[in-house]
């Protein structure tokens, strides 16, 4: 996928697992362009539980990515982008399994 000059990639491994790649630099540039910075990170003990391939830990606050930025991110059917702390996270809608975490995008 290539949208607005930003590169992203979707890969499915041999077991059917999803691997998503959009670079930190691209995601950070979108956050800055859309004035979405200054978010506080999660406490370290909670942040370590935010791991690709695992469910989103219960009780972690997540926010929808504002539509102005969401429209510029790659779209993957069955997944949604969320803001968790200051990280950009791609989560499976039906299972809450984390497909991708891009740390400190909204710092």
Task: Give the role of each language-model region.
Residues 3-107:
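Low-complexity segments
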């Amino acid at each position: 996928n290539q949208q607005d000059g930003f590169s992203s990639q979707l890969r499915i491994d041999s077991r059917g697992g999803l691997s998503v790649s959009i670079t930190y630099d691209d995601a950070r540039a979108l956050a800055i362009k859309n004035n979405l910075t200054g978010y506080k990170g999660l406490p370290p003990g909670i942040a370590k539980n935010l791991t690709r391939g695992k469910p989103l830990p219960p009780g972690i606050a997540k926010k929808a990515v504002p539509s102005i930025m969401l429209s510029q991110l790659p779209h993957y059917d069955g997944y949604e982008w969320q803001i968790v702390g200051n990280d950009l996270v791609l989560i499976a809608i039906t299972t809450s399994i984390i497909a991708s975490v891009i740390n400190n995008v909204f710092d």
